[in-house]
UniProtKB/Swiss-Prot annotation:
The modification Pyruvic acid (Ser) is found at residue 197. This is Phosphatidylserine decarboxylase proenzyme. Its cofactor is pyruvate. It catalyses: a 1,2-diacyl-sn-glycero-3-phospho-L-serine + H(+) = a 1,2-diacyl-sn-glycero-3-phosphoethanolamine + CO2.
Length: 228
């Protein structure tokens, strides 16, 4: 019941709503000006077509779809984002764990939905936000030098999993809904990142990885790992 109740809280990111309305009126004004301002209608039709395509892409980008994971969530780690697996490797994590972890990174292109989901059920232990650079999100240094938010979750089995939202070259805003001490669930939105970006998930050594490099992921649907 807790999971389903909290699902109702988030539909569309409010900043996305403002941008969509602003873009709609701007494109409408541009197209009306072209329609009434020139005799030849060919430029109007071309601009109108481009406007429709651009606006539909923006609507797709700012969606926060509600998806239900149809399996048992015990020890399951799901993809926190739509995108592509760009990193699967052991790394030294220095911000929180201070030990070796398996990092799985999902890169989100500008065409992907940029809503983020919690990768595991549990309790939020820590949330931090760091301002940083805006390098291309697929670069290795982006994990530690770009604008980023860190969310640490303790699962019901006592395993700590970290999700890190990372801004990309075009992104200038990371939104995180997580609050320390609150319960969180698979199926629930974790946050939102504007434009090209990525999400890293840090897992204990020995975790069974269920994805491969280059694999496409669907947020809250693709199982990326199984905890021991």
């Amino acid at each position: 019941m807790g999971r389903l109740k909290k699902l109702k809280k988030i539909r569309i990111h409010r900043e996305g709503t403002h941008i969509l309305w602003g873009s709609f009126f701007l494109l409408l004004i541009i197209n009306l000006a072209l329609y009434w301002g020139i005799d030849c209608k060919i430029p109007f039709y071309l601009v109108a077509l481009v406007s429709i395509v651009v606006y539909l892409l923006m609507v797709n980008f700012f969606r926060c779809p509600i998806r239900l994971f149809g399996q048992d969530t015990e020890k399951i780690v799901v993809a926190p984002a739509d995108g592509k697996i760009v990193v699967i490797e052991e790394v030294d994590e220095h911000e929180y764990f201070h030990d070796r972890r398996i990092m799985v990174s999902i890169f989100m292109s500008i065409l992907n939905v940029h809503a983020n989901w919690y990768p595991v059920d549990g309790v939020v232990k820590k949330v931090t936000h760091d301002n940083g650079k805006f390098m291309k999100a697929w670069l290795p240094k982006a994990s530690t030098e770009n604008e980023r938010s860190m969310i640490v979750i303790e699962t019901p089995e006592g395993v700590e999993v970290m999700a890190r939202q990372i801004a990309g070259a075009m992104a200038r805003r990371i939104v995180t809904y997580a609050e320390p001490g609150e319960e969180c669930y698979i199926d629930e939105h974790l946050g939102f990142i504007k434009f090209g970006s990525r999400v890293d998930v840090y897992l204990p050594l020995g975790t069974e990885i269920c994805v491969s490099m280059g694999q496409l992921t669907t947020g809250n649907q693709t199982v990326i790992a199984k905890l021991k």
